[in-house]
């Protein structure tokens, strides 16, 4: 499956890197690399995550450290919708209703 990132997920990767870099710039780079690698690997095993229907149609979640990767698979595409800290109060309002995989 082709893996893509929503604009929100792209922005969250930058925010995560900036937050971690405040204390450890080197770790910020490696952690974001790990997140991106895990997201890329989802294309090969999209069913590995937990389905979260309360968040939106087809939304699945996979943890990475203290962060949660939210994604959706449609046809031959897998879109990373959000990457959020697990301590957040996450609900359906955090996901766009009816947003297409195209961008």
At which residue positions do the language-model features occur?
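Enriched for short, Lys/Arg-rich terminal
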Residues: 67, 72-103
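Basic, Lys/Arg-enriched alpha-helical interface segments
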Residues: 2-59, 93, 100-103
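Basic/aromatic recognition patch in beta-strand/loop cores that engages polyanionic ligands
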Residues: 47-77
């Amino acid at each position: 499956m082709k893996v893509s990132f929503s604009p929100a997920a792209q922005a969250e990767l930058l925010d995560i890197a900036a937050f971690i870099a405040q204390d450890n710039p080197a770790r910020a780079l490696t952690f974001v690399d790990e997140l991106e690698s895990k997201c890329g690997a989802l294309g090969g095993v999209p069913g590995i995550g937990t389905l979260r229907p309360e968040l939106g149609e087809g939304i699945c979640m996979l943890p990475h450290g203290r962060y949660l990767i939210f994604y959706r698979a449609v046809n031959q595409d897998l879109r990373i919708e959000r990457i959020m800290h697990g301590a957040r109060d996450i609900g359906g309002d955090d996901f766009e209703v009816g947003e297409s995989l195209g961008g």
